């Protein structure tokens, strides 16, 4: 008998899972409250970049609509402010790519539907889960909307924050000249905030995503509260002022006369994210085990861009486990967690560590930045390992590990 899987939520996790399962002739129904043709009129959803490992999964799923060789980026520029600013670069072994999710998500939905996936366009609440679970061999929940996140218990030991750690101002902009190599820029203004600049394909071609991770109480926090719609010129002038003061490696490539939101006033998001890590399964009153996937399991701040990438990875692993098993109970969830948890948990821990380290600047982290800025080999390794957060956490999970990693590259600098 053909397996029947219900998926609640049409984000990257749910759609990648659905596409994987349809490749293996598994019956898939996706529940979402948004149709593909509604996306173009929405506010900016996020500023997600897909790492090379995620792009490879898209190739395998036959949804690599925008090849990275043409639309992608090839490394990271780094800028660390201070009395003696540091500028350096790290290569990616294979290009990564960012596409406006208002283009990307409807493309995935249409591809899934064309391959036999079914969609039910309706809101699903926590109260609906028990009834839905009776209709499928397995129900997978991939969205935290409508209090669905409360169904999965938060793990306090992996959820150290009770409030947002950054005041975010995120937008798609035009008028920013590309660097000599098309790349992400990660700029750090100690005590004030971080900026991640991402070359991004949007409605009118290539644009620039600016992810401003402003420290709460700092000179930059005002960017999270000043509204573009109230006075566009005043907002843009404020942005130019703050970028020039805190993130000069990006500001120096801006044409003030052209600088503006890329498409419309819908191209900006402001607010904050409360990071959380939850159990990856829940048992309903009817005894059915349901699986949490993507943001509903691991909600991370966007500072390292790990959310969609680990969601895609976890979706692939879940797909493989669905194919390998026929009973979807608590033991099934244990098999799943054994395989997906290292990457998902390490991405969460590395992100949370980075938020804290960039605020507190402990001596071992400052030493890491100093050596990173002087060792191209280390910068290349660090940059490419954005693909592999478990490798990053192997390096950052204790001061001793950071020190040991730095010691590998310090002699090459001295030489």
UniProtKB/Swiss-Prot annotation:
Its EC number is 1.14.14.11. Pathway: Aromatic compound metabolism. Keywords: FAD, Flavoprotein, Monooxygenase, Oxidoreductase. Disulfide bonds: none annotated. It comes from the Bacteria. It catalyses: styrene + FADH2 + O2 = (S)-styrene oxide + FAD + H2O + H(+). Coiled coil: none annotated. The keyword Coiled coil does not apply. GO terms for molecular function: monooxygenase activity. Belongs to the StyA family. Styrene monooxygenase which catalyzes the first step in the aerobic styrene degradation pathway by enantioselective epoxidation of the vinyl side chain. In a two-component system, a reductase utilizes NADH to reduce FAD, which is then transferred to the oxygenase; the electron transfer is proposed to occur via a diffusing flavin. Homodimer. A direct interaction with the monooxygenase reductase component StyB seems not to be necessary for the enzymatic activity. This is Styrene monooxygenase StyA. The gene is styA.
